[in-house]
Amino acid sequence: MSPQTETKASVGFKAGVKDYKLTYHTPDYETKDTDILAAFRVTPQPGVPPEEAGAAVAAESSTGTWTTVWTDGLTSLDRYKGRCYHIEPVAGEESQFIAYVAYPLDLFEEGSVTNMFTSIVGNVFGFKALRALRLEDLRIPPAYSKTFQGPPHGIQVERDKLNKYGRPLLGCTIKPKLGLSAKNYGRAVYECLRGGLDFTKDDENVNSQPFMRWRDRFLFCAEAIYKAQAETGEIKGHYLNATAGTCEEMIKRAVFARELGVPIVMHDYLTGGFTANTSLAHYCRDNGLLLHIHRAMHAVIDRQKNHGMHFRVLAKALRMSGGDHIHAGTVVGKLEGEREITLGFVDLLRDDYIEKDRSRGIYFTQDWVSLPGVLPVASGGIHVWHMPALTEIFGDDSVLQFGGGTLGHPWGNAPGAVANRVALEACVQARNEGRDLACEGNEIIRAAAKWSPELAAACEVWKEIKFEFPAMDTL
């Protein structure tokens, strides 16, 4: 070894492995307004102290690696490293705790959810020192959120485009989700829209399969939309699913939808990916298309309480990436969703400023500044008897989507749509008159059914249907 090499090796660098907590656990750190803050639920392996586990999360999701490297000396770790600045126990769980980590803004590419998630929820989730790891919440600073376009249009612009105010919007997923020909599919769309719905929807699985190619579906659905609009005098839409195997094909489908003059397209944002979703959102804003977002695959990521990522984080990511609607659970239907937690991330989707509220699972105050809001979509196992609860829980700025609750009507699709529209109008009128939907909901629906035979038939069919299972998503 030359003298020069010896000198370099002996100054400022010592090879080997050292505890993460010596560098990345900084309890005295005061967070900056520009930091991205994360709350992780950490379950360390037996014998791993909380401070070491929390510091390991901060290190492995930012600048750290398993051993000391000499190139650390070529940059400023103090400027770029993530910091575990606070640790707190999880009530009722001996082996779990919440680790709060602050990330400097310069770690992330502007306008890229893909890059942000690659760091924060990347390889660290496979780290052997941890038995499980879950990202519960993120605080996105205005300095970062302002680098995103966000939703193509937002709630107010959508209402202005549709000329619909003062009530939730009504939708319906066409069933059976797979197997219909394009012409029969378009017929079902027409019947539902003519009956009083604002939107119909492609199921998330419907892309371009042998039984129904995308171009045929788009054409027959456009015909249905224009026919229903002419008959009802209302603006109608169908969520044409542009999700495809490549970004180029996805954009091609969105271009065709725009050329048909329809108001809205759709994307499966998790299976399609954030890069594709952001690209489509940009196209939709530039070309006047609304963008409906389905969350297929979310439960793979968010349903386990100890590992993965909570949906409130996926909801924030979607607001940044871009979408005008997103499915957000129902509280009362067949899909997972506890009331206060669901309302917590619904507010994160719609509101400009959301205060920290741990009772609703919100770990950080979130200021979206001018990023447009997203309409939450309640969908999955809901029917006319749920209408009072849905109207009370979600309020006007929402989309209530009845698939089987429309198409399962004993008299057909159009009467099913009529039943839902009558039930909604009755609930909105009762609420505006000061009645309590939570207490008087069934009475309101029964009264409306007396002058709507379609609603009366729907009430009879679904009077015994319930989905009563304990929610997995609890605090």
From Swiss-Prot:
Residues recorded with modification N6-carboxylysine? K201
Q: Which UniProt keywords apply?
A: Acetylation, Calvin cycle, Carbon dioxide fixation, Chloroplast, Disulfide bond, Lyase, Magnesium, Metal-binding, Methylation, Monooxygenase, Oxidoreductase, Photorespiration, Photosynthesis, Plastid
Q: Which reaction does it catalyse?
A: 2 (2R)-3-phosphoglycerate + 2 H(+) = D-ribulose 1,5-bisphosphate + CO2 + H2O; D-ribulose 1,5-bisphosphate + O2 = 2-phosphoglycolate + (2R)-3-phosphoglycerate + 2 H(+)
* Cofactor(s) needed for function: Mg(2+)
An example GO BP is: photorespiration
Further information: The basic functional RuBisCO is composed of a large chain homodimer in a 'head-to-tail' conformation. In form I RuBisCO this homodimer is arranged in a barrel-like tetramer with the small subunits forming a tetrameric 'cap' on each end of the 'barrel'.
List the protein's name. Answer: Ribulose bisphosphate carboxylase large chain
- What is the source species? Ostrya virginiana (American hophornbeam)
Q: What is the lineage of its organism?
A: Eukaryota, Viridiplantae, Streptophyta, Embryophyta, Tracheophyta
Which gene is transcribed and translated to give this protein?
A: rbcL
